[in-house]
Amino acid sequence: LRIRMGVNGKDGKDAAGVAYGANMIFDHMSVTWGRDECFSINGDPKKPGDQPRNITIQNSFIGQGLQPHSCGGLIQTTAENGVTLYRNLYIDNKTRNPKVKGLNQFVNNIVYNWGNGGAYIMGDTEQTSEADIRNNYFIVGATLNYDGKTLGSTAPFTRYNEHFRA
Protein backbone atom coordinates (compact mmCIF):
# COMPACT_ATOMS: atom_id res chain seq x y z
CA LEU A 1 0.00 0.00 0.00
CA ARG A 2 1.35 3.43 -0.91
CA ILE A 3 0.09 6.59 0.79
CA ARG A 4 1.42 9.88 -0.49
CA MET A 5 -0.34 13.00 0.75
CA GLY A 6 1.61 15.53 -1.31
CA VAL A 7 1.61 19.30 -1.51
CA ASN A 8 -2.14 19.47 -2.11
CA GLY A 9 -2.92 17.78 1.21
CA LYS A 10 -4.34 19.84 4.06
CA ASP A 11 -1.68 21.74 6.01
CA GLY A 12 -0.91 20.21 9.41
CA LYS A 13 -2.32 16.76 8.58
CA ASP A 14 -0.61 13.38 8.77
CA ALA A 15 -0.34 11.20 5.67
CA ALA A 16 -1.57 8.18 7.70
CA GLY A 17 -2.35 7.35 11.29
CA VAL A 18 -4.15 5.27 13.88
CA ALA A 19 -6.23 6.91 16.63
CA TYR A 20 -7.81 3.80 18.18
CA GLY A 21 -8.05 0.06 17.63
CA ALA A 22 -6.13 -3.09 18.47
CA ASN A 23 -4.24 -6.03 17.02
CA MET A 24 -3.18 -4.42 13.72
CA ILE A 25 -0.22 -5.12 11.45
CA PHE A 26 0.85 -2.62 8.79
CA ASP A 27 3.25 -4.40 6.43
CA HIS A 28 5.09 -3.27 3.29
CA MET A 29 3.72 0.26 3.30
CA SER A 30 5.15 3.37 1.72
CA VAL A 31 3.98 6.46 3.60
CA THR A 32 5.50 9.71 2.37
CA TRP A 33 5.02 13.42 1.84
CA GLY A 34 2.89 14.10 4.93
CA ARG A 35 2.09 17.73 5.71
CA ASP A 36 2.75 17.17 9.44
CA GLU A 37 3.70 13.58 10.35
CA CYS A 38 4.02 10.80 7.81
CA PHE A 39 2.65 7.92 9.95
CA SER A 40 1.49 8.38 13.55
CA ILE A 41 -0.17 6.27 16.21
CA ASN A 42 -1.85 8.47 18.82
CA GLY A 43 -4.76 7.87 21.11
CA ASP A 44 -7.87 9.87 20.29
CA PRO A 45 -8.52 12.25 23.20
CA LYS A 46 -12.26 11.92 22.48
CA LYS A 47 -12.03 8.16 23.23
CA PRO A 48 -9.68 7.84 26.23
CA GLY A 49 -10.82 4.28 26.99
CA ASP A 50 -10.02 3.04 23.49
CA GLN A 51 -6.31 3.70 23.07
CA PRO A 52 -4.33 2.04 20.25
CA ARG A 53 -2.76 -1.22 21.40
CA ASN A 54 -0.81 -4.16 20.03
CA ILE A 55 0.08 -2.50 16.71
CA THR A 56 3.00 -3.39 14.44
CA ILE A 57 4.47 -1.40 11.57
CA GLN A 58 6.98 -3.53 9.67
CA ASN A 59 8.93 -3.60 6.41
CA SER A 60 7.74 -0.10 5.58
CA PHE A 61 9.14 3.12 4.14
CA ILE A 62 8.24 6.25 6.13
CA GLY A 63 9.70 9.52 5.01
CA GLN A 64 10.16 12.75 3.17
CA GLY A 65 7.73 14.88 5.13
CA LEU A 66 6.98 18.13 3.32
CA GLN A 67 6.58 20.79 5.99
CA PRO A 68 9.61 22.71 7.27
CA HIS A 69 9.74 20.46 10.36
CA SER A 70 9.28 17.28 8.24
CA CYS A 71 8.31 14.56 10.74
CA GLY A 72 8.33 10.77 10.50
CA GLY A 73 5.69 10.20 13.16
CA LEU A 74 4.47 10.30 16.72
CA ILE A 75 4.06 6.88 18.34
CA GLN A 76 2.25 7.72 21.56
CA THR A 77 0.47 5.08 23.60
CA THR A 78 0.17 4.26 27.28
CA ALA A 79 2.70 2.16 29.19
CA GLU A 80 0.37 -0.86 28.80
CA ASN A 81 -0.47 -0.54 25.09
CA GLY A 82 2.42 -1.49 22.84
CA VAL A 83 3.61 -0.58 19.37
CA THR A 84 6.32 -2.50 17.51
CA LEU A 85 8.36 -0.88 14.76
CA TYR A 86 10.27 -3.62 12.95
CA ARG A 87 12.49 -3.46 9.85
CA ASN A 88 11.36 -0.03 8.66
CA LEU A 89 13.20 2.69 6.81
CA TYR A 90 12.75 6.22 8.15
CA ILE A 91 14.31 8.53 5.57
CA ASP A 92 14.76 12.28 5.07
CA ASN A 93 12.63 13.44 8.00
CA LYS A 94 14.01 16.32 10.00
CA THR A 95 12.64 14.92 13.27
CA ARG A 96 10.43 12.26 14.93
CA ASN A 97 11.86 9.14 13.34
CA PRO A 98 9.82 8.41 15.47
CA LYS A 99 9.04 10.24 18.71
CA VAL A 100 7.73 7.63 21.15
CA LYS A 101 5.83 7.51 24.43
CA GLY A 102 4.42 4.44 26.13
CA LEU A 103 5.39 0.84 25.39
CA ASN A 104 7.55 0.53 22.26
CA GLN A 105 9.76 -1.96 20.45
CA PHE A 106 12.14 -0.40 17.92
CA VAL A 107 14.01 -3.29 16.30
CA ASN A 108 16.09 -3.66 13.09
CA ASN A 109 15.14 -0.28 11.65
CA ILE A 110 17.20 2.10 9.54
CA VAL A 111 17.04 5.86 10.10
CA TYR A 112 18.74 7.84 7.34
CA ASN A 113 19.33 11.59 7.17
CA TRP A 114 17.36 12.60 10.27
CA GLY A 115 18.03 16.33 10.13
CA ASN A 116 18.49 18.51 13.20
CA GLY A 117 15.41 17.45 15.16
CA GLY A 118 16.62 14.02 16.22
CA ALA A 119 16.20 10.48 15.01
CA TYR A 120 14.66 8.40 17.81
CA ILE A 121 13.10 10.84 20.30
CA MET A 122 12.52 9.26 23.69
CA GLY A 123 9.46 10.46 25.50
CA ASP A 124 10.22 13.93 26.82
CA THR A 125 7.16 13.61 29.04
CA GLU A 126 6.08 12.83 32.60
CA GLN A 127 4.42 9.64 31.35
CA THR A 128 6.26 6.39 32.07
CA SER A 129 7.62 4.87 28.88
CA GLU A 130 9.46 1.63 28.22
CA ALA A 131 11.27 0.71 25.02
CA ASP A 132 13.18 -2.22 23.62
CA ILE A 133 15.69 -0.66 21.20
CA ARG A 134 17.84 -3.22 19.34
CA ASN A 135 19.90 -3.61 16.18
CA ASN A 136 18.99 -0.32 14.52
CA TYR A 137 21.20 1.61 12.10
CA PHE A 138 21.48 5.37 12.07
CA ILE A 139 23.12 6.59 8.88
CA VAL A 140 24.46 10.10 8.49
CA GLY A 141 22.90 11.83 5.51
CA ALA A 142 23.43 15.00 3.56
CA THR A 143 22.23 17.27 6.39
CA LEU A 144 24.59 15.78 9.00
CA ASN A 145 28.25 16.13 9.78
CA TYR A 146 30.29 12.93 9.89
CA ASP A 147 30.72 13.17 13.66
CA GLY A 148 27.04 12.22 14.02
CA LYS A 149 25.98 15.70 15.04
CA THR A 150 23.66 17.58 12.76
CA LEU A 151 24.23 21.02 11.44
CA GLY A 152 21.82 22.07 14.21
CA SER A 153 23.44 19.79 16.86
CA THR A 154 21.24 16.69 17.41
CA ALA A 155 22.56 13.17 17.96
CA PRO A 156 20.44 10.12 16.99
CA PHE A 157 18.88 9.65 20.45
CA THR A 158 17.37 12.74 22.09
CA ARG A 159 15.09 13.99 24.87
CA TYR A 160 15.66 11.15 27.29
CA ASN A 161 14.40 11.73 30.84
CA GLU A 162 13.94 9.69 34.03
CA HIS A 163 10.48 8.50 32.92
CA PHE A 164 11.85 6.74 29.83
CA ARG A 165 13.37 3.30 30.35
CA ALA A 166 15.19 1.66 27.46
Where are the regions that the model predicts?
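Extended alpha-solenoid helical-repeat scaffolds
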Residues: 152-157
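Acidic/polar loop patches that form or flank catalytic/metal-binding clefts of enzymes
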Residues: 118-119, 143-148
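Right-handed parallel beta-helix
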Residues: 1-7, 14, 20-36, 45-75, ...
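Charged/polar, low-hydrophobicity segments characteristic of intrinsically disordered regions
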Residues: 135, 148-150
